[in-house]
């Protein structure tokens, strides 16, 4: 359980920092005229804060206290922000979360497994959307909407799904960005 608690705390810190960073990146993308990229970063910032909150609830249930050390973030060139976001999200779903899930499963920590898996699935979508933006930046200047499940943080482009693919809540539980 100690490893699972440490992993939850690391994930909480990471998701909290990603949320803060993406909020800054959203403002920079908007200022640079990339409205769809700005909306995506805003949606992802919200999703990351939801992941952090879910991790925090599990941390508390295990007797821990969720604490994050939030870094200072500044906007960069649009391509650099997207590349950094892709790298971070990819590391989470290819390395960090699979390892955390394996350890939590071995420890029988079902709530931690669910929290890690939900975040991991959303990170896959974030990386895909960031990659789409990077590969076709001009198309991402126009306004575009993104929808975030307010329960688990799943993110969808253009329209909310009928049901969340992670937690199965209906489309009215999605917030638009």
Locate each region found by the language model:
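Non-heme di-metal
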Residues: 1-177
């Amino acid at each position: 359980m100690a490893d699972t608690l440490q992993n939850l705390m690391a994930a909480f810190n990471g998701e909290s920092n990603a949320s803060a960073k993406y909020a800054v990146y959203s403002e920079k993308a908007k200022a640079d005229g990339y409205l769809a990229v700005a909306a995506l970063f805003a949606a992802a910032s919200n999703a990351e804060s939801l992941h952090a909150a879910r991790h925090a609830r599990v941390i508390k249930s295990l007797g821990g206290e969720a604490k994050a050390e939030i870094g200072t973030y500044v906007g960069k060139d649009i391509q650099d922000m997207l590349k950094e976001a892709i790298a971070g999200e990819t590391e989470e779903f290819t390395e960090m979360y699979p390892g955390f899930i394996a350890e939590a499963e071995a420890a029988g920590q079902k709530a931690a497994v669910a929290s890690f898996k939900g975040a991991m699935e959303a990170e896959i979508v974030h990386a895909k959307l960031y990659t789409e933006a990077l590969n076709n930046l001009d198309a991402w200047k126009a306004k575009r909407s993104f929808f975030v499940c307010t329960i688990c943080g799943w993110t969808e482009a253009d329209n909310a799904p009928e049901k969340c693919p992670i937690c199965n809540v209906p489309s009215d539980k999605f917030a638009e960005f």
